[in-house]
From Swiss-Prot:
GO terms for biological process: actin cytoskeleton organization; endocytosis; Golgi to endosome transport; retrograde transport, endosome to Golgi. It comes from Schizosaccharomyces pombe (strain 972 / ATCC 24843) (Fission yeast). This is ENTH domain-containing protein C794.11c. GO terms for cellular component: actin cortical patch; clathrin vesicle coat; cytosol; endosome; Golgi apparatus; plasma membrane; trans-Golgi network. Residues 30-154 form the ENTH domain.
Length: 476
């Protein structure tokens, strides 16, 4: 009881009027949308809320609800007296809101009832305070008529209202998220919320446009137009950004060009690499090894890697004699001479493996016996190209071997150090190439004097060096 008494004390006149309106809605069997219109156009001294008018605007996209909203508004214009000017004023305000935010069908229907709206431009009412309250109604009616007659202004106002609606909702001007989409589930009607009829609509493009599929579709078409306009603006913004991106792209291209120009100047590196490879000893560089032959005696025998082409003729007879005496009896003086003088004699060392007493033929054989093919006798001016046969049994044609003579068999393996020297001297006198070799030996005899001293002083290091030279010759 106390709660009922407290509520009764807090009830005022406006609460009683609201309860009376609810009762009238039930008695008069008004629909929910008609009840909202009656609430938005009541006689209270305050205006209708924006949320309530937005719900009514959503209902205009439905065909059945649209036929409930607009007739109720027009009844406010005609059925109300001058004393209820607030309801007339609120009805004009709601109709203007629907023209800007509602369906495009509202514009067509309002233009059809434009005569009723023009009558309100002459509305007069002076209250008990001698105040002209009809001024607000006349002003609002005049503005609404001007809006309905200006199609360009309607397009601008609808576009502005759509942008404001997007700001309040927080979605923007995207047509996918609209308040009108919620009207499908909130205010169901017969069939689909999309109109199945075809009629002329008032498009945002200006004036009466082509036939659309319905109220909802025409609104979505206008929304799509607006979205396309926004897309164009975004495209312009992207175009500006694209120009900046193009500038950055040009700068990057310029940097790439500079890098390519710098990279074109780099082919000098392979030459440096080739110089490094030469330092490793893969190319012909015999000159650094020659000064070492004069300074140190053990290194004198190590300069025959590629220098044997020039130093083969510079070998003295005494050095070949000493080198031949260091080996055992199985190795003859001729074999030692070949190992010391010739760089390519190892490839044809088979004929030299047999001992021979008369070594005069070896003086005419150099580089594996290739030079003994065209031996010219010094005594006669004319000669016949026949192979010259010595006492040893060798034929000079490409180093072909023959049977040994009696002197070679009697000589055996024991050779003295004086026999090769005599053979060298005798062979050089009878052969033109031998004389050349002997003259070369006489010229470099002084340079090889140090080599003879080392060979005579120590025999074992010389043999090791000789083996090392033989291995190098095999590698060649």
């Amino acid at each position: 009881m106390e709660s009922i008494q407290s509520t009764m004390k807090n009830i005022n006149l406006y609460d009683i009027k609201a309860a009376v309106r609810k009762a009238q809605n039930v008695v008069m069997n008004y629909t929910s949308m008609e009840a909202r219109v009656r609430e938005a156009t009541n006689n209270e001294p305050w205006g209708a809320s924006t949320s309530l008018m937005m719900e009514i605007a959503q209902g205009t996209h439905n065909y059945s609800q649209l036929n409930e909203i607009l007739p109720m508004i027009y009844r406010r214009f005609t059925e109300k007296t001058a004393e209820e000017w607030r309801q007339i004023y609120k009805a004009l305000q709601l109709l203007e809101f629907l023209v800007k935010n509602g369906s495009e069908r509202v514009v067509d229907d309002a233009r059809a009832h434009q005569a009723t709206i023009k009558m309100l431009r002459n509305f007069h009412y002076i209250d008990h305070r001698q105040k002209d309250q009809g001024l607000n109604v006349r002003t609002r009616a005049k503005e609404l008529v001007e809006l309905l007659n200006d199609s360009e202004r309607i397009r601008k106002e609808r576009k502005r209202a759509r942008q404001n609606r997007g700001k309040f909702i927080g979605v923007g001007s995207d047509g996918d998220s609209r308040i009108s989409t919620s009207s499908k589930s909130r205010f169901p009607s017969f069939g689909s919320s999309r109109g199945s009829y075809r009629t002329r609509v008032y498009g945002d493009g200006g004036g009466f446009t082509d036939y659309g599929n319905g109220y909802h579709d025409s609104s979505s078409m206008s929304d799509s137009r607006d979205a396309s306009d926004n897309d164009v603006e975004e495209y312009n913004e992207d175009g500006d950004g694209g120009s900046s991106d193009a500038a950055t792209a040009n700068s990057t291209r310029g940097s790439r060009r500079t890098t390519t120009k710098q990279s074109d100047k780099a082919p000098e590196q392979p030459k440096q690499e080739s110089a490094m490879i030469d330092l490793l000893g893969l190319d012909n560089e015999p000159s650094p090894a020659q000064p070492q032959t004069n300074t140190s005696a053990p290194l004198a025998f190590e300069d025959d890697g590629f220098g044997d082409f020039q130093s083969s003729a510079a070998a003295p007879a005494s050095s070949t004699l000493n080198n031949a005496s260091l080996f055992m009896g199985s190795q003859t003086a001729s074999t030692a001479a070949k190992n010391d003088d010739d760089a390519f004699d190892d490839f044809q060392s088979a004929p030299s493996a047999k001992p021979a007493s008369n070594t005069a033929a070896f003086s005419s054989i150099s580089f594996g016996g290739f030079n003994s093919l065209n031996q010219l006798p010094t005594s006669s001016s004319a000669f016949t190209p026949q192979p010259t046969t010595f006492n040893t049994g060798y034929t000079s044609a490409f180093g072909m071997s023959s049977g040994l003579s009696n002197t070679s068999s009697q000589a055996g393996l024991g050779l003295t150090s004086q026999q090769p020297t005599a053979a060298k001297s005798s062979g050089s006198n009878g052969d033109a190439f031998g004389s050349l070799w002997s003259s070369a030996v006489n010229k470099v005899h002084q340079e090889n004097s140090t080599r003879e001293r080392v060979v005579s002083s120590s025999s074992e290091p010389v043999s090791k060096t000789q083996n090392f030279l033989d291995n190098d010759n095999l590698l060649l």
